[in-house]
């Protein structure tokens, strides 16, 4: 697994409400997480965004998992990008091309799974780990392209500060400030995590034609021009609206921790089929046939990761 290193961390200030001239957007929906409890791979599982085909394009799935033993052994992917963020603990990642790495709390990894991706995600040293993973659609023209990985260490995130707010921009841009360069991926997104003291606020300026999700890890906030309340494990979704710069206002009711995702819709039909995200059910079935025929490559002979491939 290749790891990209980025330039020295930048320190800057978020725009205050008086500095920003962008139009503030209102939240479209607030969605409660669905608690699934224990699953075959996870000791505790929450669907922040259950697998949808296009409602929040380009975001297809957002899921939180906690595990300390099995985790997600060798499994395939095709036609999808993933952004995995480590909430707590350490996550071990391997792929069948020989890549290996360990992500710690606050680290992230971006993967584009084109024609063939075969990997596993495990609790490092069998100690508890909690992750949040987003699935992001790929355009049809890129679903059979090459597979790539980029590690995004917390230490390399762009640090953005203002009174009562500490944010880390992992990828994308906010108010002219940039995170890691992931321009090699086909559907660039912006992703940041932020800690807010009670009564603190900030504005996230983004193009109006992007979908935005504000997920509350802890505490309670108000978001958008209508000051919509969002509590722990709730997510406020903002529809794509128009071209031009807009602002997503986040105000902390209590001390709060939030994760913010934004991306431009792909605008193509898509079908989720187990670990595959193609444009038709037939293409998903073909991917599974190719995986079973061994076309994704051999599964390494590693006693800790040789369980049957797991479908998320």
Report the location of each language-model feature.
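Jelly-roll (double-stranded beta-helix
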Residues: 1-312
């Amino acid at each position: 697994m290749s790891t990209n290193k980025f330039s020295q961390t930048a320190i800057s200030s978020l725009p205050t409400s008086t500095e920003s001239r962008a139009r503030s957007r209102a939240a479209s929906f607030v969605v409660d997480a669905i608690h699934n409890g224990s699953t075959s791979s996870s000791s505790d599982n929450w669907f922040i965004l259950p697998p949808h085909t296009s409602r929040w394009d380009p975001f297809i799935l957002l899921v939180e998992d906690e595990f300390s033993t099995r985790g997600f052994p060798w499994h395939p992917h095709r036609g999808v990008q993933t952004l995995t963020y480590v909430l707590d603990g350490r996550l071990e990642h391997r792929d069948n091309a020989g890549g290996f790495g360990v992500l710690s709390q606050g680290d992230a990894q971006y993967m584009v799974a084109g024609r063939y991706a075969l990997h596993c995600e495990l609790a490092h040293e069998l100690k508890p780990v909690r992750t949040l993973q987003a699935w992001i659609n790929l355009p049809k023209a890129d679903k059979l392209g090459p597979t790539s990985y980029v590690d995004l260490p917390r230490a390399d995130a762009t640090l953005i500060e203002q009174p009562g707010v500490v944010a880390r921009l992992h990828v994308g841009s906010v108010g002219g400030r940039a995170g890691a360069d992931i321009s090699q991926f086909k559907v660039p997104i912006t992703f940041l995590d932020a800690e807010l003291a009670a009564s603190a606020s900030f504005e996230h300026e983004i193009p109006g034609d992007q979908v935005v999700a504000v997920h509350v890890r802890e505490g309670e906030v108000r978001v958008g021009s209508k000051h919509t309340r969002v509590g722990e494990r709730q997510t406020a979704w903002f529809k794509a609206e128009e071209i031009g710069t807009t602002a997503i206002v986040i105000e902390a009711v209590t001390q709060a921790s939030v994760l913010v995702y934004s991306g431009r819709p792909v605008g193509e039909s898509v079908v989720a089929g187990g670990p595959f995200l193609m444009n038709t059910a037939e293409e998903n079935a073909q991917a599974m046939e190719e995986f079973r025929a061994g076309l994704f490559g051999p599964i390494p002979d590693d006693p800790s990761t040789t369980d049957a491939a797991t479908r998320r």
